[in-house]
Amino acid sequence: MPLLSQMQEYQADTTFAQLEALRQKLREYEYHYHVLDNPLVPDAEYDRLMNELKNLEWQHPEWITVDSPTQRVGAKPLDGFAQVTHEIPMLSLDNAFSDEELDGFLRRMESYITEDPHTLAFCCEPKLDGLAVSILYVDGVLSQAATRGDGSTGEDITSNIRTIRNIPLKLNMDNPPARLEVRGEVFMPQKGFEELNERALEKGEKTFANPRNAAAGSLRQLDPKITRQRPLVLNAYGIGVYESDDELPATHFERLQWLKSIGIPVNNEIRLATGREQLLAFYANIQAKRPTLGYDIDGTVLKVNDIGLQEQLGFISRSPRWAIAYKFPSQEEMTVLNDVEFQVGRTGAITPVAKLEPVFVAGVTVSNATLHNGDEIERLGIVIGDTVIIRRAGDVIPQIVGVVMDRRPENAKKIEFPTACPVCESAVVRVEGEAVARCTGGLFCGAQRKEALKHFVSRKAMDIDGVGEKLIEQLMERELVHTPADLFKLDHTTLMRLERMGEKSAQNALNSIEKAKNTTLARFLFALGIRDVGEATAQNLANHFHNLAAIRTATFEQLQAVQDVGEVVANRIVRFWQEPHNVAVVEDLISQGVHWQDVIQVEIADNPLKGKNVVLTGTLTQLTRDQAKALLQSFGCKVSGSVSSKTDYLIAGEKAGSKLAKAQELGVKILTEQEFIALTGEN
């Protein structure tokens, strides 16, 4: 909303006490965000309250005080670190949330410079979501590092900054400045964040909510050894103090390139843009790239490129006039939890789903969010009626990441986890050691039957592409299909009676069903939906036993001899075949013509691929990714999605990227597609 329109919404009778209460609320949020690294509300809510305070102070300038949040940058530092006074204040940026507010930023510059802002060159950068730092080099050697803190005083984090691998301890130049202060953002890439949380879970430790919290918590450890273990990265965005006989370049963009030339890392997405349309194009381009960047950003930063013009434009109390952060629509918002419903999955898992007051988050309206399980409800301390924080990043399913406790209503209601299935009323049980509660109804439960059918026809199972979720729902609602075998009994007349089913659609579905009869033993096993038997385990079972009869009669001990089959999975396979209903469905499927060739035992004792950990990357030209994976699994290989010290081989197709670089770094054996095919003996 334009600033003027917002101002008109406020009543003239606002009291000083109300304004002070708003300031105190903002101070509390700032303290939790900057000092405790534990945000209480989404950034969007903080920004809204800050705008409200700015507007109230605009209406009542006589009420502005030097300690107002509008006059400061961050929060006071903790006493656990030595304090560092910034010679040049580390200011924050004003924000724009719409094209109209960007226009206002350009228009305001007209009062301070003679040039037309719409023809100026801007240095455009992604707005990294990390922690702002200052790093001082004396005679080219890293001497001191500090957090931004409140803009005037930060915390001395020199020992921790020294542990970050992409920050040089010595500048890459012959005649370094006497003093050079590099300013930048320390952040944690998404992959490193995920691996950090995985390790924490394995150790039973607390996980971080997001990469920013992880970066902040890691950078402000009192023990640098802990920081050294964290995957932190610096991207420089500017220069503070500079003392040298040599002059710096005259533009911001050139200064960043100079920093890069002396070993200081800068972001690869920085571009120059001239005029409004190019600024908007940069914003749109970075927003489109956001899901694939590999690190969190929450907008763009647009800076007048000419340093002389920056100096002419100057500063206001807490930010420069020559730069603005044009932020993306928030990925976090607040809304109210109206109710919780419980869904039943293919394996009987009971999943609580939050029913929310609809809220616009990251470009879409969200009214539902997963709550995962009872443990998550307990961890969040959430009750019906709470104001909650919703996060939606990229294509990730919206989730509740926090509760705003000071907004809990008096009539809030505890969430009661069901003891009976909401679909079939069978008992709900939770096995000791598992987080998930499950319906015990099995295929008696309509919800489990529906999800089992969806799994059966899926691409990696029987691959019946003419039968989708909506068709399965119709078939079940009309009680035309009860088990997977019933799909193979459908005829043209039956399908034509269904809604939105034309002649061509019906025939396509029947053709897909007929085609699916010819499958593989591994696909068939996976399609049966035996709990914890995924693609790889199904392939291992097929390779080990060679035929279905051997699998059906395998003992617990024989199953445990299969690669990656432990006690739990072996038990589940045995129990599956002990259930008469399951055996009847399998026999019915075979009687309907579902068939496959038994797996031929191939002697692979001398093949170097046997039993190895393998990763695929890049574009393969002679095989599809699925074909290559199946071929590897036939040699008993474990196919992984990421490179680690445990990886034996990396098969690199065309345009291989970061996985190839990591494999080279770790000394992993690298095969081309041709070398891989030669090893397998495939033509």
Curated annotation (Swiss-Prot):
Repressor among keywords: no
Binding-site list for Zn(2+): 421, 424, 439, 445
Catalysed reaction, written as an equation: NAD(+) + (deoxyribonucleotide)n-3'-hydroxyl + 5'-phospho-(deoxyribonucleotide)m = (deoxyribonucleotide)n+m + AMP + beta-nicotinamide D-nucleotide
Residue numbers annotated as active site: 127
Requisite cofactors: Mg(2+); Mn(2+)
Residues the entry annotates as binding NAD(+): 43-47, 92-93, 125, 148, 185, 303, 327
EC nos: 6.5.1.2
Occurrences of domain BRCT (ranges): 604-683
BP GO terms, sorted: DNA repair; DNA replication
Pfam families per the UniProt record, alphabetical: BRCT, DNA_ligase_aden, DNA_ligase_OB, DNA_ligase_ZBD, HHH_2, HHH_5
Annotated PROSITE patterns: BRCT, DNA_LIGASE_N1, DNA_LIGASE_N2
UniProt xrefs under InterPro entries: BRCT_dom (IPR001357), BRCT_dom_sf (IPR036420), DisA/LigA_HHH (IPR041663), DNA_ligase (IPR001679), DNA_ligase_AS (IPR018239), DNA_ligase_CS (IPR033136), DNAligase_adenylation (IPR013839), DNAligase_N (IPR013840)
A cellular component term, taken from the record's GO annotations: cytosol
EC main group: ligase
UniProt keyword list: DNA damage, DNA repair, DNA replication, Ligase, Magnesium, Manganese, Metal-binding, NAD, Zinc
Stated family: Belongs to the NAD-dependent DNA ligase family. LigA subfamily.
PANTHER family: CHROMOSOME TRANSMISSION FIDELITY FACTOR 18 (PTHR23389), DNA LIGASE (PTHR23389:SF9)
HAMAP family, per database record: DNA_ligase_A
Free-text function comment from the UniProt entry: DNA ligase that catalyzes the formation of phosphodiester linkages between 5'-phosphoryl and 3'-hydroxyl groups in double-stranded DNA using NAD as a coenzyme and as the energy source for the reaction. It is essential for DNA replication and repair of damaged DNA.
NCBIfam families from the UniProt entry: dnlj, PRK07956.1
Protein name as catalogued: DNA ligase
